[in-house]
A protein has these predicted regions:
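Bacterial N-terminal signal peptides
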Residues: 11-22
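Sec/Tat signal peptide C-region and signal peptidase I cleavage site
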Residues: 24-28
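N-terminal catalytic or cofactor-binding beta/alpha core of small enzyme domains
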Residues: 30-461, 478-479, 483-488, 497-499, ...
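An aromatic- and histidine-rich active-site surface loop
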Residues: 504
Length: 553
């Protein structure tokens, strides 16, 4: 969605009802419009015993508040501290009031009206998060910085919990309730707000249209167990919020327009086709077709990785919902979990066909069914990125980036950038033995081409360059969709440096005191600012390569 440079085009949805003033009507003593017709309402209530999702059960979990490495002792749940600290604590109460007011009545009298409401509320939450990140939403003194991304994730969970507990008097079937959750998830991630322009701007400048994705926070620990992982942010999510709707003038005078959305760190939404349903409409032919599609996630320490190869394989790490798609003792490409399997205690059972060790994009976008029967190269085991690597490495995107305390790199400033050409594979797809092709190790320059070894079609992927988790999955689905549409555009993945670095009390990390009870500190915020700034420079570099007609490496 495009935003005005200094003022938001959007505001929170007001709880107001319009009325037509009929002849002779006037204002009643209670402030209502006398003679006006009020919308019909139905009874409603709350089911506080409704089973919460695995992620929602973290809402009451605090950071460590006693013991070693704790300076402050705040026992407030981390989610509450983040949401209040960002000024987002009004969203869930307002949402609850729209669903069911204090008098036990609601104008949401049907499933269709409920679907409309959750779409509105989800989009309002996304817009508010983008506005905050881009300086269009007031931030009180002492609040978390505008660049913080975490309030969107935790506010969303407060709202999905409320929606789950809503009990309208009209019949709301299980499938309908799930559809409401799905729509809210998509709307609150910016997936319904993408709005690419036509070819030319009002001033005659040509547009270069780019879609980027970021991720939720992740590695949040076990619900109910205090841990420092809860305070994690995600620099890819912060980048998405900072850049959604932004335009940048490129070297040739054209305009780069960036539209952004967020993805969850759980396998089921990917298996349902969330990413393809977001990107697919913009990959189709038409006057607003995308020119570049870049997925972004958090990778390793102090380096940007431009991934060369994305693998079809799922690893054995759980998503934020606790579900694992490829158990370690069954980790072969053709393994599929039986429906109803529970992969971790307290998590939802497997409910989607094709949930297993290989990624299966949806038939509606892929053009064929890859989930019913495993076929080695339908789709490909390793999908190649099409990034203008040579131009990005030559752009010196580290220039002008203030290096955070404790960060190291070969470059004079900022972080190193490397073409990440490694991958792991099964030589025999039915045998668990794997082999590795290492990366080239060259920073801030193109490597010798002889160090870049492409895979062959006889092997099966074990890891893409960025591993086997959901960042690799987003990258794989993006490039497979590119190929399904036979697009020749920049499409690839940027792994950004790890952001979740707090003071440790030692000089090498900046010398600040370690406090595992703190929700933020200056070192953490310095990492976020530096990573977002250099990621922006890389994306503008992709835009300049587009303008120059550069070829992918």
């Amino acid at each position: 969605m495009r935003y005005a440079p200094h003022a938001s085009r959007y505001s929170l949805f007001a709880l107001a009802v319009s009325a037509t003033l009929l002849p002779g009507a006037g204002w009643a003593a209670n402030g209502d419009l006398a003679g006006a017709r009020k919308p019909p309402s139905v009874a409603c209530s709350w089911n506080r015993e409704a089973a919460l999702s695995y992620e929602e059960r973290r809402l009451d979990t605090p950071l460590p508040f006693s013991g070693a490495n704790v300076v402050t002792h705040d026992q407030t749940p981390l989610a509450e501290r983040i949401v209040k600290g960002a000024g987002f604590d009004g969203f869930e109460p307002a949402f609850a009031k729209r669903l069911c007011a204090a008098d036990g009545r609601t104008p949401v009298s049907s499933y269709a009206k409920a679907l409309k409401l959750v779409t509105e509320e989800g989009r309002a939450l996304w817009r508010a998060a983008v506005d905050r990140a881009q300086g269009r939403r007031a931030i009180p003194a002492g609040a978390l910085p505008a660049s913080d991304d975490r309030m969107l994730y935790w506010t969303r969970l407060y709202m999905t919990r409320t929606l789950r507990q809503w009990a309208p008097s009209f019949h709301l079937g299980k499938a309908q309730a799930q559809a409401l959750q799905w729509r809210f998830e998509r709307a609150s991630r910016g997936q319904l707000d993408i709005d690419l322009p036509r070819r030319y701007a009002a001033d005659g400048s040509r547009y270069r249209r780019m879609i980027i994705s970021g991720f939720d926070v992740f590695t949040l620990g076990t619900p109910g167990t205090a841990n420092t992982g809860l305070r994690n942010g995600n620099p890819s999510g912060a980048t998405a919020l900072a850049l959604d709707g932004r335009e940048f003038r490129l070297a040739d005078g054209s305009l780069l327009r960036i539209e952004a959305y967020l993805l969850p760190v759980s396998y089921d939404p990917f298996n349902r086709g969330m990413q393809e349903d977001t990107l697919g409409p913009w990959f189709r032919p038409g006057p607003r077709r995308v020119d570049a599609s870049i997925t972004i996630s958090q990778g390793g320490a102090n380096q940007f990785w431009l991934e060369a190869w994305n693998g079809r394989f799922h690893g054995s790490s759980a998503g934020n919902d606790g579900i694992v798609y490829c158990p370690a003792d069954s980790a072969l490409p053709n393994y599929v979990l039986p429906l109803g399997s529970v992969t971790n205690p307290g998590t939802a059972p497997i409910s989607l066909r094709g949930s297993g060790c290989n990624i299966n994009p949806p038939r509606r976008w892929l053009g064929y069914d890859s989930a019913s029967r495993w076929r080695q190269n339908l789709p490909a085991q390793l999908s190649k990125a099409s990034l203008p690597v040579r131009q990005l490495l030559a752009a010196d995107t580290w220039r002008g980036i203030e290096r955070p305390p404790g960060a190291t790199s070969q470059a004079a400033e900022g972080f190193d950038v490397t073409w990440h050409t490694n991958y792991d594979f099964f030589p025999d797809c039915a045998n668990p033995r794997t082999e590795n092709v290492p990366t080239n190790g060259v920073m801030n320059a193109m490597p010798d081409p002889s160090l870049v070894l492409p895979p062959n079609r006889r092997i099966c992927a074990r890891n893409g360059g960025g591993g086997d988790y959901l960042s690799n999955e987003s990258a794989y689905r993006n490039t497979v969709l590119r190929d399904a549409f036979r697009l020749e555009i920049p499409a690839g993945h940027i792994h950004v440096p790890v952001m979740n670095n707090y003071y440790t009390g030692v000089p090498a990390s900046g010398g600040g005191a370690r406090n595992d009870n703190a929700i933020s500190d200056a070192r953490y915020e310095a990492y976020r600012s530096a990573i977002v700034a250099q990621t922006r420079a890389l994306l503008v570099g992709v835009g300049n390569a587009l303008a120059q007609g550069a070829q992918a490496d």
